């Protein structure tokens, strides 16, 4: 089942949260000269036209990136991420949104590498064309969850693994946990960043319970809700679960989340939280 297209949702509040966390982790990894791997299990098309029929049909970016990218009081924690967005929109008009692979491409250094996977028959060729001239990147049409077995550990023994499946199938909620467990067996020092949507809170509670049962330590949860939990409204919140987070990430997100919530949710509904699922 491959009906999900991220082009309908690019630049929404969930992307803002995901890419804020992604960029902060990458910037942290760059503090050491040693190279690292960026592995993206569900990479998407790479770049999204916000004037496309898909994006215009939902207009989700108007309540996401459009609300923050030109703010004068932008927190320092958002600079790396927003600078990438501005790089793709030099005219000052918000026309393109960079997905996680393009954010990584701009932030990574010459010595770092990218391993990108996408299975969707329409998105894979777009992703491949984005990276055809980038010698640091390897793009594959494959099952993203299998990459957690096949591509780990990296030679450098340093890396960020971003896992953000579409959750089209309910089994994805179990697949992310088993995939992380497999990856962790091979690469216990890697940073794993798992994105999740809150559609039914019970699914997330079950997923977190299963993750706790793996015995993995150092699991940080970051969540941004635009509406209260509901079983009728679709996605009301999204979150990032980070295993082995950089030591600064908790404080950075505590600094920036209240600002993001105030800009993205002017009505003040929902919540913004940073908490440990499992401490060290």
Curated annotation (Swiss-Prot):
Recorded GO molecular functions are:
23S rRNA (adenine(2030)-N(6))-methyltransferase activity; RNA binding; rRNA (adenine-N6-)-methyltransferase activity
Keyword RNA-binding in annotation: yes
Effect after changing residue 164 to A: Loss of catalytic activity
Which reaction(s) are listed as its catalytic activity? adenosine(2030) in 23S rRNA + S-adenosyl-L-methionine = N(6)-methyladenosine(2030) in 23S rRNA + S-adenosyl-L-homocysteine + H(+)
**Has UniProt tagged this entry with the keyword RNA-binding?**
yes
Q: What is the effect of changing residue 4 to F?
A: 40-fold reduction in catalytic activity
Instruction: Locate the site labelled Interaction with substrate rRNA.
Output: 4
Task: Locate the residues binding S-adenosyl-L-methionine.
Answer: 19, 42, 100, 118, 143-144, 164
Per the record, what phenotype accompanies loss of this gene's function? The inactivation of the this gene results in the complete loss of A2030 modification, but does not cause the accumulation of ribosome assembly intermediates. The phenotype of rlmJ knockout gene is very mild under various growth conditions and at the stationary phase, except for a small growth advantage in anaerobic conditions. Only minor changes in the total E.coli proteome can be observed in a cell devoid of the 23S rRNA nucleotide A2030 methylation. Mutants show a stationary-phase competition defect during coculture with wild-type cells.
> Catalytic center at which residues?
164 (proton acceptor)
Q: A Gene Ontology CC term for this entry?
A: cytosol
Signal peptide range in chain numbering: none
Pfam families assigned:
RsmJ
The impact of changing residue 18 to R is: 10-fold reduction in catalytic activity
**Could you provide one GO biological process annotation from this protein's UniProt record?**
carbon utilization
Q: Please describe, based on the UniProt annotation, the reported consequence of changing residue 4 to A.
A: Loss of catalytic activity
Alphabetically sorted, this entry's keywords are: Methyltransferase, RNA-binding, rRNA processing, S-adenosyl-L-methionine, Transferase
Q: Subunit details for this protein? A: Monomer.
Q: What else is known?
A: Recombinant protein prefers protein-free 23S rRNA to ribonucleoprotein particles containing only part of the 50S subunit proteins and does not methylate the assembled 50S subunit. Recognizes a minimal substrate corresponding to helix 72; this shows that RlmJ requires only a small hairpin for activity and this suggests that RlmJ can methylate A2030 before the 23S RNA is completely transcribed, processed and folded. Cannot modify single-stranded DNA having the same sequence as H72.
The task this protein performs is described as: Specifically methylates the adenine in position 2030 of 23S rRNA. Nascent 23S rRNA seems to be the natural substrate. Appears to be not necessary for ribosome assembly. Required for the utilization of extracellular DNA as the sole source of carbon and energy.
Q: What is this protein called?
A: Ribosomal RNA large subunit methyltransferase J
Q: What is the lineage of its organism?
A: Bacteria, Pseudomonadati, Pseudomonadota, Gammaproteobacteria, Enterobacterales
């Amino acid at each position: 089942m491959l009906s999900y297209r991220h082009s309908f949702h690019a630049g929404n509040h969930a992307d803002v949260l995901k890419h804020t966390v992604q960029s902060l982790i990458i910037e942290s990894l760059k503090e050491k000269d040693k190279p690292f791997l960026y592995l993206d299990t569900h990479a998407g098309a790479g770049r999204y036209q916000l004037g496309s029929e898909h994006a215009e049909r939902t207009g989700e970016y108007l309540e996401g990136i459009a609300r923050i990218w030109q703010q004068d009081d932008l927190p320092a924690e958002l600079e790396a991420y927003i600078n990438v967005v501005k790089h793709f929109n030099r005219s000052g008009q918000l026309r393109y949104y960079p997905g996680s692979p393009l954010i990584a491409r701009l932030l990574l250094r010459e010595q770092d590498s990218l391993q990108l996977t996408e299975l969707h028959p329409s998105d894979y060729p777009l992703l491949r064309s984005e990276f055809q001239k980038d010698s640091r990147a390897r793009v594959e049409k494959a099952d993203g969850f299998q990459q957690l077995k096949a591509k780990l550990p990296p030679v450098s023994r340093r890396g960020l693994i971003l896992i953000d499946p579409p959750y089209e199938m309910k089994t994805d909620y179990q697949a992310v946990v088993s995939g992380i467990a497999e990856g962790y067996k091979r690469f216990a020092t890697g940073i794993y960043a798992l994105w999740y949507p809150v559609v039914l809170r019970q699914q997330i509670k079950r997923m977190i319970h299963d993750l706790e049962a793996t015995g993995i330590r150092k699991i940080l949860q970051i969540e941004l809700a635009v509406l209260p939990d509901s079983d009728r409204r679709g996605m009301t919140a999204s979150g990032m679960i980070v295993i082995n987070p950089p030591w600064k990430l908790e404080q950075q997100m505590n600094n920036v989340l209240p600002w993001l919530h105030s800009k993205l949710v002017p009505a003040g509904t929902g919540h913004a939280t940073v908490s440990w699922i499992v401490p060290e």
